[in-house]
Amino acid sequence: MSKIVKVIGREIIDSRGNPTVEAEVHLEGGFVGMAAAPSGASTGSREALELRDGDKSRFLGKGVLKALEAVNGPIAQALLGKDAKDQATVDQIMIDLDGTENKSKFGANAILAVSLANAKAAAAAKGMPLYAHIAELNGTPGVYSMPLPMMNIINGGEHADNNVDIQEFMIQPVGAKTLKEAVRMGAEVFHNLAKVLKSKGYNTAVGDEGGFAPNLKSNAEALEVIAEAVAAAGYKLGTDVTLAMDCAASEFYDAEKKEYNLKGEGRVFTSNGFSDFLEELTAKFPIVSIEDGLDESDWEGFAYQTQKLGKKIQIVGDDLFVTNTKILKRGIDNGIANSILIKFNQIGSLTETLAAIKMAKDAGYTAVISHRSGETEDATIADLAVGTAAGQIKTGSMSRSDRVAKYNQLIRIEEALGAKAPFRGLKEVKNQA
């Protein structure tokens, strides 16, 4: 009943109007799984390769016909007759067939779309929700939790056309008792932030991830207007709502000069100086998590940052670790950061993603499940967060259906699981239990 009989790939459109790969996996019993690959804007240099056509006459070179050739040709042929329930074998067949270190032959976008579609088809064949199937693949059947959201309500950096250098300013509704309540609190702060920005004469257009993208005077002002919005919504900053940031510091790092350049406010920092700047912000605001607070190659700087802040807050590696167990192991062995951001298109298969989550948890690191800035209506990351009991999810703001689709899926899952999937709030964040 779970043998693969057909694999289909197609080109669909993501939330930025660019093509991406969608795959369908059909099984013997008439079961079908469908999934789409997301796409990043600020990408780590060690990520698995997203294969684009480069033909400027189609989609400005961003077409994915080459990746589709792989899905509809060699991948489809190699998977015929294989058991979809054996996810590790399905993924390994594609990885071996590609034969490159970074999946550059077929593209991580091709392999991932098929990998996720296969998991969905297998879940359907087993007659269980995707999150339950993922928990079984993870070796933790029946173990679930609802993740604490990190909601990106002010967008800067590569996610917005403004003068704010730090890429994401996020809220975490830690005072909520349930995921559904956390979503409501986030929505209320989001709407109050719109009022605060308008009252100051700022633009309320949104960025790629659904957060506002105003031209603020400084990065600290982003935290100040969020603090105002939290109060206006009737919540207490630090108790009901905490703050988180994704610096995406590789985007404003000058490798030649070894400097971090916040152009928006005309300030330049050394590596340790930027970590000291972040420490100052954590003293002024209840920031409990900082992601990519330095360039992905600045391991020495990350050692200093972890030593400085790693006992107080969550230090998340995104571009630093790129969901790659080899790189994560180096971080763990050297005491670099204490958390990993999980983006399955950085590594390119569900099996490898689950391995990264397990390695992180075994080492006492937290794992934050994440979307990409280029998304679709595919909500697989919601099931991944619940099925691995990861504890935290980052899936954008309270606008744009490509973001909200994930929150809505989480609401449905929480309703289905009830007390079997506890919402632990701030306890999920490293150093905040």
UniProtKB/Swiss-Prot annotation:
Annotated Mg(2+) binding sites: 246, 291, 318
Comment on bound cofactor: Binds a second Mg(2+) ion via substrate during catalysis.
Official protein name in the record: Enolase
Gene Ontology molecular function: magnesium ion binding; phosphopyruvate hydratase activity
Assigned protein family: Belongs to the enolase family.
Additional comment: Pathogens have evolved a strategy to activate host plasminogen and manipulate plasmin activity for their benefit; plasminogen binding (even without its activation to plasmin) increases their adherence to host cells. Plasmin activity leads to degradation of host extracellular matrix proteins like collagen, fibronectin and laminin, facilitating bacterial dissemination and disease spread. Vaccinating mice with recombinant enolase provides substantial protection against subsequent A.hydrophila infection, suggesting it could be used as a vaccine.
Enzyme class: lyase
Matching InterPro entries: Enolase, Enolase-like_C_sf, Enolase-like_N, Enolase_C, Enolase_CS, Enolase_N
EC number: 4.2.1.11
Organism taxonomic ancestry: Bacteria, Pseudomonadati, Pseudomonadota, Gammaproteobacteria, Aeromonadales
CDD domains (UniProt xref): enolase
UniProt function note: Catalyzes the reversible conversion of 2-phosphoglycerate (2-PG) into phosphoenolpyruvate (PEP). It is essential for the degradation of carbohydrates via glycolysis. 'Moonlights' as a plasminogen receptor and plasmin activator. Binds host (human) plasminogen in vitro. Binds human plasmin and plasminogen on the cell surface; enhances the activity of host tissue-specific plasminogen activator (tPA). Plasmin bound to bacteria is partially protected from its physiological inhibitor alpha-2AP (SERPINF2).
GO biological process, any: glycolytic process
Subcellular location: Cell inner membrane; Cell outer membrane; Cytoplasm; Secreted
Record text about domains: A 'plasminogen-binding motif peptide' partially inhibits binding of plasminogen to enolase in vitro; mutating 2 of the residues restores plasminogen-enolase binding.
Keywords for this protein: Cell inner membrane, Cell membrane, Cell outer membrane, Cytoplasm, Glycolysis, Lyase, Magnesium, Membrane, Metal-binding, Secreted, Virulence
Pathway note: Carbohydrate degradation; glycolysis; pyruvate from D-glyceraldehyde 3-phosphate: step 4/5
Catalytic site positions: 209 (proton donor), 343 (proton acceptor)
Induction remark: Three- to five-fold induced in a murine peritoneal culture (MPC) model as opposed to in vitro culture.
NCBIfam families, per database record: eno (TIGR01060)
Co-factor(s): Mg(2+)
Organism: Aeromonas hydrophila
UniProt cross-references to SUPFAM superfamilies, sorted A to Z: Enolase C-terminal domain-like (SSF51604), Enolase N-terminal domain-like (SSF54826)
